[in-house]
């Protein structure tokens, strides 16, 4: 190494990536903490995505969102998504966090941060992570209006569903449609043992 070159610290490993699912009552996401986690002297860029609860949807006033999850599976899938992002992009550090329970209008429910030497890697990784979170993590959202409520379907998940009921994250074929209309009607299929 030349005398005028500074050593570059190694990028964080996947074991150092920050994955959090905050249980109901844990309060707001600590955005500064996640940004600080991905901060790295060798990084020339930090990209973030903050998903917030909007106050209206299709002319209806949104009061809050309510999130439920299969926690252990959601954590495993989030960690896998970060590994996939690392495999596809040259990254320094990653963080992803998602709230469960009630998230009032104006507050953040999900946050993604990625750092990289160059901005393109950080921005592309950040987009990849949030797209995969929406498409494949078992977290469900109920939108609560001032005049009712409805479970929301993720278009990203439905876009991946094939005509035989399989998805990118669930390769087992479906055998019959679920009974009744439910929140998803014919889009949900049940495998019989």
UniProtKB/Swiss-Prot annotation:
Which organism encodes this protein? Oryza sativa subsp. japonica
Write the protein's name: Molybdopterin synthase catalytic subunit
Subcellular location per the Swiss-Prot or TrEMBL entry: Cytoplasm
- Main EC class the enzyme belongs to: transferase
- What do we know about how this protein assembles, alone or with others? Heterotetramer; composed of 2 small (MOCS2A) and 2 large (MOCS2B) subunits.
Instruction: Give, as in the UniProt entry, the pathway in which the protein acts.
Output: Cofactor biosynthesis; molybdopterin biosynthesis
Its job: Catalytic subunit of the molybdopterin synthase complex, a complex that catalyzes the conversion of precursor Z into molybdopterin. Acts by mediating the incorporation of 2 sulfur atoms from thiocarboxylated MOCS2A into precursor Z to generate a dithiolene group.
GO cellular component, alphabetical, reads: cytosol; molybdopterin synthase complex
Cite the record's Low complexity compositional bias ranges: 163-178
A family per Pfam: MoaE
> Which gene does this sequence derive from?
MOCS2
């Amino acid at each position: 190494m030349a005398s005028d070159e500074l050593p570059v610290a190694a990028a964080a490993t996947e074991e150092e990536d920050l994955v959090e699912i905050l249980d109901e009552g844990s309060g707001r996401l600590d955005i500064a903490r996640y940004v600080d986690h991905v901060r790295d002297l060798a990084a020339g860029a930090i990209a973030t995505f903050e998903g917030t609860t909007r106050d209206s949807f299709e002319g209806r006033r949104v009061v809050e969102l309510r999130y439920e999850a299969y926690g252990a599976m959601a954590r495993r899938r989030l960690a896998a998504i970060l590994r996939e992002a690392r495999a596809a992009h040259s990254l320094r550090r990653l963080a992803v966090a998602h709230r469960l329970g009630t998230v009032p209008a104006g507050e953040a429910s999900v946050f993604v941060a990625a750092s990289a030497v160059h901005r393109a890697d950080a921005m592309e990784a950040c987009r990849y992570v949030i797209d995969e979170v929406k498409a494949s993590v078992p977290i469900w959202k109920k939108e609560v209006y001032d005049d009712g409520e409805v479970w929301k379907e993720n278009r990203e998940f439905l876009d991946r569903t094939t005509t035989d009921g399989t998805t990118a994250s669930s390769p087992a074929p479906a055998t019959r449609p679920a009974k009744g209309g439910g929140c998803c009607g014919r889009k949900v299929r049940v495998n019989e043992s």
